[in-house]
Every structure is written in C-alpha cells, then in structure tokens.
Amino acid sequence: MTDQENNNNISSNPFAALFGSLADAKQFAAIQKEQLKQQSDELPASPDDSDNSVSESLDEFDYSVAEISRSFRSQQEICEQLNINHMIQRIFLITLDNSDPSLKSGNGIPSRCVYLEEMAVELEDQDWLDMGNVEQALFARLLLQDPGNHLINMTSSTTLNLSADRDAGERHIFCYLYSCFQRAKEEITKVPENLLPFAVQCRNLTVSNTRTVLLTPEIYVDQNIHEQLVDLMLEAIQGAHFEDVTEFLEEVIEALILDEEVRTFSEVMIPVFDILLGRIKDLELCQILLYAYLDILLYFTRQKDMAKVFVEYIQPKDPTNGQMYQKTLLGVILNISCLLKTPGVVENHGYFLNPSRSSPQEIKVQEANIHQFMAQFHEKIYQMLKNLLQLSPETKHCILSWLGNCLHANAGRTKIWANQMPEIFFQMYASDAFFLNLGAALLKLCQPFCKPRSSRLLTFNPTYCALKELNDEERKIKNVHMRGLDKETCLIPAVQEPKFPQNYNLVTENLALTEYTLYLGFHRLHDQMVKINQNLHRLQVAWRDAQQSSSPAADSLREQFERLMTIYLSTKTAMTEPQMLQNCLNLQVSMAVLLVQLAIGNEGSQPIELTFPLPDGYSSLAYVPEFFADNLGDFLIFLRRFADDILETSADSLEHVLHFITIFTGSIERMKNPHLRAKLAEVLEAVMPHLDQTPNPLVSSVFHRKRVFCNFQYAPQLAEALIKVFVDIEFTGDPHQFEQKFNYRRPMYPILRYMWGTDTYRESIKDLADYASKNLEAMNPPLFLRFLNLLMNDAIFLLDEAIQYLSKIKIQQIEKDRGEWDSLTPEARREKEAGLQMFGQLARFHNIMSNETIGTLAFLTSEIKSLFVHPFLAERIISMLNYFLQHLVGPKMGALKVKDFSEFDFKPQQLVSDICTIYLNLGDEENFCATVPKDGRSYSPTLFAQTVRVLKKINKPGNMIVAFSNLAERIKSLADLQQQEEETYADACDEFLDPIMSTLMCDPVVLPSSRVTVDRSTIARHLLSDQTDPFNRSPLTMDQIRPNTELKEKIQRWLAERKQQKEQLE
C-alpha cells in the first residue's frame, strides 16, 4: 500500500479525529506497531502461526488501524494522554520525543523544547510526558548546566525564532521556573475542564521546585539562585509585569514557610538582602537604578514574611555603636545623598564641581534636578517605614526599636567636641546624610496630624520623654522605643514625678522620634552651613586681596574657594528640597500650637483659645525637652537665611508661631533657659517682614507676612515680651554672658524698629514707657526703665569699643602703607595681617551694634521723652551723646579715618545724624537742656559748633541744621548760668556731696544696710543695673531707701544762704 493509501485509510478511521493531526495519528500507529512486533519476537513460534496469522490476510495499514482501535478503551484516554503531553511541553518547554519534526503537527506544540535525552533513554520506549513523570523531567531539566545545547525543533518550520530559543534554553533556573509558572497560569485559563487539575498541578510543581531550589541551592551547579531572584524582580519592575512576579513569589514564600526543616525562611532570604546591600551601597542619588531596587524593598516591606526577615536583617552587630546603623541595609539607603561621602573630599563628587565656571542658571537647574530625585527618594523611604509600621505589631515594634536605638546610639552627635573632632566623629556616628534623609521620611509620617487644628496633635503625651529605662517587653507593651530622653533638659524643672499612662499612641512616638532626628541631623547641618558661609566670605576677601597684590597664594585661595563652594552648594541643595521644607514647616507650626496649648494648661484633645493674662497650670512643660523648641527656632531661622520664600507663601500659619514666641519669650516661668528665650527673638526677626530685602518676582514679596504681623491680636504682649527678654539676658549666669548678650540683642533692634513703624506696636511700647514714668521708684524698677538703662549701657560700650578698634586699625594701616611690615619675617607679617583682620572683624561687629543702639534711641526719643529727661537717665544719655560727638566731629575724628569705612560698617555720618536727632527730640525739655552743660567731661560750646559744621558738610536738611544751632545757643546760655552757680557752690562740704558722683546732692537718701547717704538719682541709676548696695553688696531695692530729710534741709538752707550772700555781693 502506498503512503497516499495509508493516509487515506487512517483518515477514514473515526478514532483519528482524536489526534491533533493526521501526522500524530500516523506516528502513534507506528509506535504501536513497533511495540507489538517486539512482543511477538520475544514469544516462541507456534506451528499454527503461519496458518492463523491475520496479518497476512489483512493489508498492513488496515492492521495498524485495527490495533489503534483495540489499544484504547475510550476516546477520553487517548485525548487526555496526548493533550497532557502537549500541555507539559508547552509549560516546561521539555520533551522526550526527538522524532522527525515533520511527523509532528504544529498544533499545540512549542516550536523549541529541551530534549531530555538521559530520561528518554531511561524510559526506553515512552517518548511522551505525563503526570507520573513530569516531576522527574522537570528536575532533570533544572540540573542541565547548559540547556541551550539540548534544544530540538518540535515543528518543521525553518523560520528563525530567537525568542523560542531563549525561552526554552533559559539557563537561569529561577527565571525559568517563573516563566513556567506564567505559562501554567495561561494554560489554566485555556485548557478544557478535564485538563484543569493537571494544569494546576504543573503550576504547583513550579512553586515546589522553586522552593527546593531556594532551600538547596548547592545542588544546582553554576546557579546563583538569589542573584537570579533579585534580577528577576529588577527586570519586572523596569518592565510591566511586577505583579506577576510578586504573585509567583507569594506562593513560593508560602511554600517555604510551610517547610522550614532544611532551612528557616530567614536563612533562605538573607542572601537576597545581602545582594541588595552590595548593589545599593555603590549607587548615587540620581541613578534611576537605585529607585528600582527601592521598589523591590518596598515590596519586601509590604510582604509580611519578608518584612520580618528585613527588620531582623537590619539589626546592627553592636546596637550601641551609632556608626554601625549606617552599615545596615536601611542605613546604606539613608546614607545616599548629594552631600559629600567623605567630609572635605570633593574629588569624585558628582555634584557642583567647578561652580565658578557654571552660571547661576546652570546651578539652579542642577539643584532642581537633584530636588526631583530627593523628593522621590524620600517618598520611597517613607513608604518603607510606613509599611513596616502598619504591617503587623511585630514589624512595628522592630522598626521602632531600630529607630529608637539608632537615635540613642547617635546622641553624641550634638556634643560640642563632636563638631571639633570630625575624624573621630565619623568613626563613631552615622552621617549627616543618614539623619537628613531619616528626618525627611519621619516628617512625612507626621503629616497626617501636622495641622494646627488637628485633634490628633493634642493627643501627644509629654510624659513619654520622662520615662526612664525599660526592658524590651515593657517597651513593646507601652509603645516606648526612644531611650535617654529623661536625661534631656526640659523647658522648666519638674517639681514631681509625672503620672505615666499604660501606653502611648503612635502620634507621641512619631513626634518624639522626628524631633530628635531633626535635632541630631538638620540642626547640626544648619550650624555647618552658617560656618561654611562665613568661611566662604573670608576666603573670597582673602582671594581678592591676593589678586590685587599679585600674591602667589591667589591660585591656592581660588582652589580652596572652589572646593568650599562645592561643599556649600551640595549642603544647601540637600537641605532645601521644597517638599521636605514644607513638611518640616508644617511640623514646626504644629509644634508651636502644641507647646502653646501645654503652656496654657490644656491637657485635652481640643484646642483652647489663647487669652492674656495667661492661666496657671503648665506643669506638662516640665517633661518637654528643650530641643522641641530649639528645633522650631532653628528651622525658622534657617528658612530666613536660605529659603525665605517658603515663609512668605506659608505666612498664614505664622500666626501660631507668633503666639508661641509671645508666650515663651516673655515668660521665664514657662521657659527657664534665657539662651533659648533669647533665640526666640532671632526667630521673631526671621519670620517678620524684611522691607529692605530684594523682592522676588515669583513671590508677593513680604505682603502676607506684613499683614499677619501688623494684624497680630496680641501685639502689646509681643512687644512687652521682646523688651522683657532684652532685659533678662543681661544676667544669664553664663561666664560669657557679657559677650553673648550683644549677639542675642542683635536681632532685637530691627524688630523694635519695625514695631515702632506699626501703630499697634508703637502704642504698646509707649504704654510701657508711661507706666515706667509713673512708677520710677517702685520696689522693682519698671521694665521699660531697665530696658532704656541697658540700651544706653550697650550704646556707650559698643561705640566706645568701635572707636578703640578703628583707632588701632588706623595705626596698623599707616604702618603697612609706610612699608614697616616689609622688613618683618614671614611669620611676623602673618601675625600682623591676622591681627589687622581680627581688629577689622571686631570693629565691624561693634560698629553694626552701635549703629543699631543709637538708631533705636533716635526713634524712641521721637515720642518718649519724660523718661529720658528724668534725672535718673538724663545725665547718662547726655554724657554719652557728648562723648561720641567729641570723637565724631571734634579734633579726635582724624584717628578714626580708616581706608574704607564700609569694610568695617563705620557710618559716622549716620551716627552724627542720629545723635543730633536725639538732641532735637529731647531739646524741648528745659531740664534736659539744663543738664547738658553739667557734663564737664565732654561738653563745650565749641563741640556743638563743630557739630553744626559737620551737619552742613554731610548735607543734612536746612531745618535740622537751624534747629540744632538754636538748641546749641540755648544750651550755651544755660551753661553760662550754671557756671556762675557752680562758682557760688564750689566750697560745699563733703557731707553735701554724693560719695559716688562727687556732686552736690539734691535729694539725699540713706541706704538701709550700709547707712551711707547718696543722692536719690545716683542710687536709682545704680539699681537699674545692679540691685545691691554699692557699698556692701547687700540686696537693695528702691522701696528700702529712706529720705535723709535732715540733710536735705541743711543743704537747702546752705544753698539759700550762698544765694543770698551772692546777691548781697552783687
């Protein structure tokens, strides 16, 4: 029979329809015939064989069809066996059949498969796969070292199919099993119902074999299983099938959890985290690949079993070593930043290199690009932490413990010595980048309750910060994971042990963690930024000087400037990511609200309206660490310096900050630390409008802040609080209080000036002055009187110091210009240069401050006069003004003519103008004018004539010059009269003279402890600065002194007698 006849015969058989193709039916028939032949060959020959042979009487192919019909009991058996074989081939891309592809149909058969030769030999004549041998076949496939060498064509197609080769010959067994899992999933959706259990079984096989691969990876030669897992996830994230991979992993993880006899799940997965750690640590902030790895970790922190392994994996070897946390997987991530990896080393730094060669626009573009990556980076870290906190109580406890222990181990970052010894610092503690990123992520966690009216905000319980050491179980029960906060200095001393609750909410823990992280990170970086800024200025000045003098040091200075500028721009960029700053501002405004509510005794969850006078009951502040308030102030000052636009765009929330400043600046009962209260004045200066700044076209300048500041409901209390802290910092108890007070008062002058220009504040200040005028002799000197006394003290000291430094600078400049330094040794010359630079810095500081103090006196005296002309203050302010005029307009002025006034902020014209303004403001008062000539040290008619000449020279308005000339004439007339009187009273006995001032007493009083008699005005001035008896240092107040009526009457009788004698002589 021909092939054509054979095909026709088989095709006419009804069972042929069960096969995928005629070729399949023909192949099956051939196999069956061969098997029967082998069986007949093995049996002994029968004598009747030749006679009884049916095959001889039947056509060869008719016989084959008959055998097919007899071999299967039903159509279902034939169909299932063939379809299972095909399905297994499609899923696992393996086969036992290496027959001619032309004999196979392309229907339902993959184009390429791995031929399992050894297994085919072992099974001898079975060349199909079934559920009985598929597991063995899959295992054999997994053991092949190079499956690509075992590929065979399953179809007769000659078209090159690279994807089929790649899929079937996949060498990486983890990826291969995942692909099998996906193909099995697809089969489940397509196969008929009778094959569905077999498809599911194949799918389960991929999972169980993947579990085996992970449990015993050593069996599989040259297969890095864990690397393959990571690469598979990485590829999935970068593609669009991540959910498919995670579905597969979920089932594998479940299988691993159910079978931990060989290895625990943690042991299986730790190598995966090792790989991630090794890969991530070398990545940069702006590398896209970093974010793919972070997405992998995001999945792991969402998956409950992987998350448990993760929180165990990130535990440092030594929990007490702060730097060790940076070496963990989470720490390596947190250490990624645009900050320098090694402090001071800009080589190989990828950001802001050679900044002087970049335009401002190019630098802004780079900064904006980094900020985009930072925003994404912080979001990923935040999501990881959020996942761990929400996943389970176990992961929540573990991650909070990690954070608490980390902060405690790094608490030394705030120590003064740590900043002075950077080499040791970076060996002991985690980096600035670590804490900046951690702070940014924690800030995001706080945002849900960082709203001024949030009821959740007020559930914060400050007693959390007073808890002492707890064991791990207690921490878990109480939800307390921070350590060592009980050793922090709090806003006020605690009077008694607080009542601790059973446990604390997450709001309390989040706030404490975030604030302490900011204190360890942002706070320190801000200090560094200020220092870098100062160093840049100094380097710039030195560089320009070197260029002008053609010094060989110019190139070196330029290189130093470039390096430092790179550090500055990198640090500034890291700290000014807009979303982080906005989140931090939200937190700090909320903290202002919280502290205000605690300060007025609110222990509920709903805010109470602020009213003055403040109610009693603020004991909770005894458990609030100072760094809560310090962070608030530090951040707002940072914004003023480096990101002022945010203050303007968020102006509406600043009212809460003004509430905070008003309460705590003016209340030593609620904030004991005078240094911290003084810092709040700097905070006030930071948030108030600055009308002298260059307007930003993108922001409505200072309009919104001006509105908030001018419409502030508690303007009188704020003005009083500012003046109170100005006075209080005179005596802080610090050994450096004298130098500190000038720095603390620096921001207060512009605030006072701005307040004076606003009606509500100016009236409040005048009210304080009126009260002081009416209570000059109160037991405690009135606040405003003490303020004016200190203001004049400062003015006298500062301008006098500035004059001294300018005189020294003048001398040194002359020496240098004459060439006297040229003959000095290089070391001596350097010392001279350093000395000149130091004098310059000191002169500049004292000039700035003296300009402010004299300017403040000028505007205050425009409407406040009675206090200044009172004997308590008049003599002091007059002697001060005359002394300064003597140096500024008299013969001594030549000693102050340094080369460049602006370099030292020396403004003699402004000073002369302000001093003359004060004279004119107070000149209407007769007793003030009468007191001017009594200044025997500096006053002379010539001095005022010289002043008029200078006023003309500096082009002051004509009406001012005329007014001052008239005042000078009036004072000269009074001086002549006083000279005559002094001659009359020149021989007064010592009993009538003040023992301190050696002047005739007008109102003698007796001091209670020393029993010494002094003039009332003398002791009153003394007590403004020092409330002790000047003769024995005993405590003394004005209400304790007693008038010496008898002596006063004697003086008055003597004066009357002398006057009468003089009249008789005339």
Curated annotation (Swiss-Prot):
GO molecular function, one term: ubiquitin-ubiquitin ligase activity
GO cellular component, one term: nucleus
Subcellular location: Cytoplasm
Region feature (Disordered): 33-57
PROSITE patterns (UniProt xref): U_BOX (PS51698)
Keywords: Acetylation, Cytoplasm, Transferase, Ubl conjugation pathway
GO biological process: ERAD pathway; protein polyubiquitination; ubiquitin-dependent protein catabolic process
Primary location class: cytoplasm
Swiss-Prot/TrEMBL catalytic activity: S-ubiquitinyl-[E2 ubiquitin-conjugating enzyme]-L-cysteine + [acceptor protein]-L-lysine = [E2 ubiquitin-conjugating enzyme]-L-cysteine + N(6)-ubiquitinyl-[acceptor protein]-L-lysine
UniProt domain U-box: residue ranges: 987-1061
Modified residues (N6-acetyllysine): K386
Pathway(s) served: Protein modification; protein ubiquitination
Pfam families with a match to the protein in the record: U-box (PF04564), Ufd2P_core (PF10408)
Family: Belongs to the ubiquitin conjugation factor E4 family.
Role this protein plays: Ubiquitin-protein ligase that probably functions as an E3 ligase in conjunction with specific E1 and E2 ligases. May also function as an E4 ligase mediating the assembly of polyubiquitin chains on substrates ubiquitinated by another E3 ubiquitin ligase. Mediates 'Lys-48'-linked polyubiquitination of substrates.
Domain statement: The U-box domain is required for the ubiquitin protein ligase activity.
Name of the protein this chain belongs to: Ubiquitin conjugation factor E4 A
Lineage of the species this protein comes from: Eukaryota, Metazoa, Chordata, Craniata, Vertebrata
